[in-house]
Amino acid sequence: MVSTHIGGPAETVTVFVALSVGAIFIDLFMHRHDKPISLKSAALWSVFWVVVAMAFAGFLYVHHGAEVASLFVTGYALEKVLSVDNLFVMMAIFSWFSVPDRYRHRGLYWGIIGAIVFRGIFVAIGTGLLSLGPYVELIFAVVVAWTAVMMLKGGGDDDEIEDYSQHLAYRLVKRFFPIWPKLSGHAFLLTQKEVDAELAKPENKDVSVGRLKKAALYATPLMLCVAVVELSDVMFAFDSVPAIIAVSREPLIVYSAMMFAILGLRTLYFVLEALKQYLSQLEKAVIVLLFFIAFKLGLNATDHIWHHGYSLSATTSLYVVLGVLALGILASVIFPEKPEAENKES
């Protein structure tokens, strides 16, 4: 782990905020209408977010040097790769709630806003905990390694469909709001007046919600879906934040790397959804990277305890992350996933 200290210089923070907020407004303006996002559009927007991140990396290179820029790019690439598995979970959630493609971008937006907030909290806590000593790094190493082991053991469970009605987030929303059973545009909540208007429609004559027992607000399936996505991402952050902190203890580097990676996830989601069957080996790449990060954390912790002198530079970490990602993509091309019908026949 590299502990390059840059603090929180006003100029760097200003550029970070201006780039990220400006790009968010551009994205929101261009996607203000509820319509499906094509693969071409998603790919172009994914490139846009990578360019924004690399622009910030260029700023760091000019103002703070190659080492800091390398740490940022390593953290950014690592968060992108680790997020792939999380995006596949999001696909399963949207599918289970039967959310149409035209509403998924809006649902992802609110899910990612929550991710940005919680990542900030976890980064502050994580970097603060590491200041307590090397034994905290060992704990982080065990957490990351355990995640890799569980992913390895659960590799064959991809076809199992989870019942998200038993999810904690689902049950929490249901405790505070009655549930309107149908989507109502991109609305997350409906007022009693809106529910009455829905109940007046012939196709809703069999719906009993809101007829006898009235309420101020009703949660829609889109609200339930976003709540499940949000809590699932929080659980994912428990694994990803220690992994990114393994790259650097500098909060600004860690958070900015995660922030720019997360902001591009909405459009990356649609790219992965279209190319999912062609990226079948990426999960294995994620597992390899988690073991690498656990090793890096453990190596750094034992160096602090026993002073053996071994460590991995930021450049080496960057090469490993990019190399494993490239191998994962190459393996997916060489060993593509068999279609379901072919799997059943064999």
From Swiss-Prot:
Is Ion transport one of the keywords?
no
Secretion signal: which residues?
A: none
What membrane topology was assigned to this protein in its record?
A: Multi-pass membrane protein
> Where is the chain membrane-spanning?
6-26, 42-62, 81-101, 110-130, 132-152, 227-247, 252-272, 286-306, 316-336
Q: Where in the cell is it found?
A: Cell membrane
UniProt keyword terms in alphabetical order:
Cell membrane, Membrane, Plasmid, Tellurium resistance, Transmembrane, Transmembrane helix
Q: Which GO terms describe its cellular component?
A: plasma membrane
Q: Which domain of life is it from?
A: Bacteria
Mainly resides where?
Answer: membrane
Provide one Gene Ontology biological process annotation: response to tellurium ion
Quote the function comment for this protein: Could conceivably alter the intracellular level of tellurium in a manner leading to resistance. Alternatively its presence in the membrane may provide a barrier to entry of the tellurium ions.
Q: Which family does it belong to?
A: Belongs to the TerC family.
PANTHER family for this protein: MEMBRANE BOUND PREDICTED REDOX MODULATOR, THYLAKOID MEMBRANE PROTEIN TERC, CHLOROPLASTIC
Task: Identify the NCBIfam families for this entry.
Answer: R_switched_Alx
Protein name per UniProt:
Tellurium resistance protein TerC
Q: What organism does this protein naturally occur in?
A: Alcaligenes sp
